A protein has these predicted regions:
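Aromatic-lined ligand-binding clefts that engage carbohydrates, nucleic acids, or primary amines
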Residues: 166, 171-185, 218
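Bacterial lipoprotein signal-peptidase II cleavage site
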Residues: 17-27
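Accessory carbohydrate-binding/adhesion or oligomerization-edge regions at the termini
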Residues: 27-138, 220-250
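Bacterial N-terminal signal peptides
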Residues: 3-13
């Protein structure tokens, strides 16, 4: 009897061991938290394209400064002229004078044109800097064919540009007469701002400037309210005489 009981106990122990081996106790495993999905990365917006001035050709020259009489010398009569642009409002508040119509091309102070540079206006139309020269001393805008100015057209403005090519550094006087007002830049520096309404006379303003050796960019913006529309500009010494060694390119 004792032998039977011992055999039964032994069988129970063996069976328990087999059950434990078949079903091992699971270990405690820490749950790994799910990672939040990464936020979608939005591509950086492409920088707005800055309109580039379309260049159709090189500048022309050199040309001599013009002379009318012995005491009327040094006139710049070869220009690149672009227009017309609007100059709305009533004097003395015509707003075109203070509007930078070259803002999409670097701005008036930084702008550099060449023969054929295109400017897209706010209304979508395109105007160009094109060469013009006169056999006189005055730039009369109504005579500039490519501007297509209608008879007695009012409240407009134009830009004119040229290069003064100097054979050395020189102190000069740039003398301006205008109908009506103007802004003048030389080598991208604002030299004068005359928001006036007047008839033109020679040498209404005298600006003492220093030309560098080589080409010096001159840009002038001339506005019109009513009546005649013109300007004259000459480059002379303090005695009003032409200075040798200066030519003009446009």
């Amino acid at each position: 009897m004792m032998l039977v009981l011992c055999l039964a106990a032994l069988c129970a122990v063996i069976a328990g061991c087999q059950e434990e081996a078949a079903s091992p106790k699971a270990k405690d495993v820490k749950a790994t938290p799910e990672k939040e999905p990464a936020a979608a990365v939005k591509p950086a917006p492409a920088p707005a394209e800055k309109p580039a001035a379309a260049v159709a050709g090189p500048i022309l020259g050199p040309f001599k400064l013009a002379k009318n009489w012995a005491d009327e010398q040094g006139f710049v009569v070869n220009w690149l002229i672009c227009g017309v642009f609007p100059n709305p409002g009533e004097r003395p508040d015509n707003t075109g004078f203070g509007t930078d119509y070259l803002k999409n091309y670097g701005g008036e102070a930084a702008f550099t044109p060449t023969n054929g540079t295109e400017i897209k206006k706010d209304d979508g139309s395109v105007v160009k800097f094109l060469p013009y020269s006169t056999t006189g001393t005055d730039i009369i805008f109504g005579d500039v064919a490519h501007l297509k100015i209608e008879s007695n057209q009012e409240k407009i403005l134009c830009y004119c540009a040229c290069w003064l090519d100097s054979d050395a550094d020189k102190d000069v006087e740039v003398r301006v007469g205008s109908d009506d007002g103007y802004k003048l830049w030389i080598n991208h520096q604002l030299i004068s701002e005359m928001h006036v309404y007047r008839a033109m006379e020679m040498d209404q303003e005298t600006h003492k400037v220093k030309l560098n050796k080589g080409k010096n960019l001159l840009l002038i913006k001339v506005d019109q309210d009513t009546g005649e529309y013109q300007f004259m500009l000459r480059v002379v010494g303090s005695d009003g005489k032409e200075i040798p060694g200066i030519t003009v390119w446009n």
